[in-house]
A protein has these predicted regions:
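Structural motif
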Residues: 17, 100-102, 141-143
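Phosphate-binding P-loop
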Residues: 2-16
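Substrate-engagement module of ASCE P-loop NTPases
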Residues: 122-146
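Conserved P-loop
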Residues: 12-94
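Helix-adjacent hinge/juxtasegments
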Residues: 74-122
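Short beta-strands and strand-loop turn motifs
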Residues: 53-55, 104, 142-146
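Short, glycine- and charge-enriched coil/turn segments that flank and shape catalytic ligand pockets
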Residues: 40-48, 94-98, 116-131
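Residues at the starts of beta-strands that form the adenosine-phosphate
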Residues: 49-52, 99, 139
Length: 146
């Protein structure tokens, strides 16, 4: 993924989906996009832009705990992380004041919904999430496996 070059001077309310294989660097690539957006917003701003990271992973085993910790350590301290394994739409709407929202990762979120074994809840949450993304006036960068 390091061969990609993305300009931050694009539509300010764009929605971006970063796809890749497991451990392919997609989170790091998405974080680079967020950093580009941050850098473009910080110029001339009175206050630093707010970056909201919605993490959907659940630390259910040692390997996942280590991965979550590594991701947190890799991000700038000023980025606010919100852990939300199920109710993603509610969290997106709650972050209406953020300048940029990063969601990592949709694959884990869908897996979490499937594990609830409640088809109606899953359909409702997916529909609500799609509406929340559509209605969101901030750029959203989303990460998912292929």
């Amino acid at each position: 993924m390091s061969n990609f070059s993305i300009s931050a001077a694009s539509n300010p309310i764009e929605k971006t989906l970063v796809l890749g294989g497991v451990k392919s660097g997609k989170s790091r690539f998405a974080e680079g996009l967020v950093q580009q957006r941050f850098d473009s917003l910080v110029e001339g701003a009175d206050t630093p832009p707010t970056i909201a990271v919605i993490a959907t992973a659940q630390a259910l085993d040692d390997e996942m705990k280590k991965r979550i910790a590594r991701h947190k350590d890799d991000r700038p301290a000023a980025w606010q992380t919100y852990e939300e394994p199920l109710y993603l739409a509610k969290q997106v709407r709650a972050l209406a004041d953020a300048d940029v929202i990063l969601i990592d990762c949709l694959t884990l979120w869908l897996t979490n919904l499937l594990m609830c074994d409640d088809d109606e809840m899953m359909r409702t949450e997916v529909d609500d999430f799609l509406s929340a993304v559509k209605d969101c006036s901030q750029p959203i960068i989303m990460v998912s496996n292929e």
